[in-house]
Amino acid sequence: MAVNTLKPDQLRVCCPAEQFDFDSTDELEDLDDFIGQPRALAALDFGIGMRGDGYHIFALGENGTGKYSLIRRFLEKQAAAEEVPPDICYVNNFDEQHKPRILVMEAGTGKELADRVKNLMEDVRNALRAAFESEDFQARRQSVQQELQEKQQKAFEKLQQMSQERDLTPLRTPAGLVFAPVRDGEVLDPSELEKLSEEERGELEKKAEELQQEAQKVFQKIPQWQREIREKQKELNREATQYAVGPVFEELRSRYEDKPAVTEYLESMEKDIVDNAHVLFQSEGGQGQAGEQPSPNLPVPSDQGQTGESPALRRYRVNVIVDNSKTRGSPVVHEDNPTLQNLLGRVEHLAHMGALVTDFNMIRAGSLHRANGGYLMVDVLKILQQPFAWEGLKRALRSGRITIESPGQMVSLISTVSLEPEPVPLNVKVILLGAPRLYYLIRQYDPEFGELFKVGADFAHRMDRDPDNQKAYSRLIAGVARKEKLYPFGRDAVAKVIEQSARMVGDSRKLSVHMQGLTDLLRESDYWARQNGTERVRTEDVQKAIDARIFRSDRLREMMQEQIRRDVILIDTEGSKVGQINGLSVIMLGDFAFGRPSRITARIRLGKGDVVDIEREVAMGGPIHSKGVLILAGYLGARYAMHHPLSLSASLVFEQSYSGVDGDSASSAELYALLSAIAEVPIKQSLAVTGSVDQLGRVQPIGGVNEKIEGFFDICKSRGLSGEQGVMIPASNIQHLMLRNDVVEAVEDNAFSIYPVETVDQGIEILTGLPAGEPDDAGRYPADSINARVFEGLAELARRRKAFSGSGTQAMKE
């Protein structure tokens, strides 16, 4: 059952630079297509093509996989062939001021309408000024005013005549109009009144009372006369305004005969101007009519100081919130800060005389408005972090309308009078970007999510490594270098990058499509090329970038290795010991991982077949590690204790472990330590072991095999390579090996060895130097084999247990 050590060419799958037919990446063209994401691209193509309800897309992939750039390029390519969506405008609703109306215009015509309406209002202002200042209008206006004056004059003349007939005259006093007696044209003073008889005074008072009642009738008619005059003045204003602005509006309406919504708006606008022409004329500095007031309206902010436009004219603007005049194809919008208002739009307010006021001109578009008719990209984590944003987006997608809402109004925190803009019809394809765990969490806990986002575009972080993909990868490198304005990469440097890409995914048969990691490596390689004064990135520049990145992150690794070298952490790399073995684990520090050897010990005693995981007992072991330990008991019982009870109690521990332990990659090492303790056969300490094991004794693959091998190699190298040292790995992990060059060179010099094993029996033979032993037909193992010693050791424990149980029972009887 001999196992051959791995050859150097099995430890690292190199990328021969000779396979490339270019000298540097300057000679290569950028990739026309996307690389390594066929599944995600198929999902995107399907999701974009499906126009049914709920076929929005969730792009799931880890950060750095390049999903944003890929999706953006994909969407822009698709959008270029699509129609430009319409412009979106808000205009005043003259019937309900707080409910502005929308106008959906063909692309580029919204701003055109706004400019035409602005010019129209200039013409209206000039026409009104000319009409109201004309001699004819002034004469008619004066005639209306004269009518009121004549009525008042006739009424007072009648009162005057009646007063004279009664020897009285009207006098104006602070208390009102009074009538005083006269003699010979002179008003009688109080002393003269006293000289009159009672009868004469009574007669005068009676006449004065009659006149007072007549005067009261006149005063009661004056407000009615004034109302009649005002109505005539308004009608005069309307007639003059209609005559002045009618032709102006008719000309503009004729341009939009095929757009009923626009002509309807222009008609209501004309009617409002006709009804409020006096207000417009007053705002322009004209002579308004006394007592005339504008129609009811919300308070509006004034920007007269900035634009020269009066507040009264704001109501006739066209607020273009989405202008697609310069858009080519359908829009592709990325919302980086997806708050509720940034998504759905908002109504701004200004402080005006101590109150917050607004109007339809202060409606602002959200990203859903700008992306309407196209595509909206949103980071799902960011939208979940914003209050009300996620619910607002779902509500818009469900209803197919964009309704502008403020967070304060949604929770009734404020009672400020605001607007209720008419909702905008929504036609958009939303692409959420996020990590896979978020996708599955939202899908599990939000029942509406699956109804709205029916398409999942799953982005891979690796792709197959074959000659065609390696050539495509070289073009990818060329494209990134050009985009980032980096030095060209020589073909030897390209080969090195490809090898490092395989190392990044921990698989010699795969390449990383983690675009952020690749781009960072290329940038850093370019930096070292410039530092070295070359004009092309070489292999040594790429290697320097790799080494420098490790050096910046490996302080903790060096500290641990120093503690091992100084015997603060006890790790043996020579000799043999019973029940002790070197296990291997991986420590992750951000994006840097390194291997660390750990001393695992096993101790046995008489018991009831339990294997105690000390890490679990003190709550330092994870569930996967505990599962691996329980598998060991199953293996021991099934293989060695079929004819007698498993009568041992064993304890396993990672010595000098002061943090949590999880994973089952050390379960084979723990089993070897147990077998050594049971058989009392020492294990070589010059070897380290990694690999999980099943109940049948098969060694299973693990992760981080490269880091684990290198971690033990570094310790052995620091103490001096003896040629006896090495690492035992699962045979199925050979395909994942992309070891450092110094490890490969040590193996080539026979200073270090890598042993691939498939079964526990193969591993125990390497560790002890003794044969494992195969059972015969009777189930007996060859003498002096490891399995025979284990079998005998467990049988002896069973006999002791039986003897102990028997003596204990006899003692109790006695």
Regions found by a protein language model. Name each.
Residues 1-443, 448-470, 474-491, 495-536, ...:
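Conserved ASCE/P-loop NTPase catalytic core
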Residues 25, 182, 603-605, 655:
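Generic beta-structure capping elements
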Residues 321, 601-603, 653:
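Residue-level recognition of well-ordered beta-strand positions that form the cores
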Residues 359-368, 374-387, 391-393, 409-419, ...:
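Peripheral, non-AAA+ core regions of ATP-driven protein-machinery
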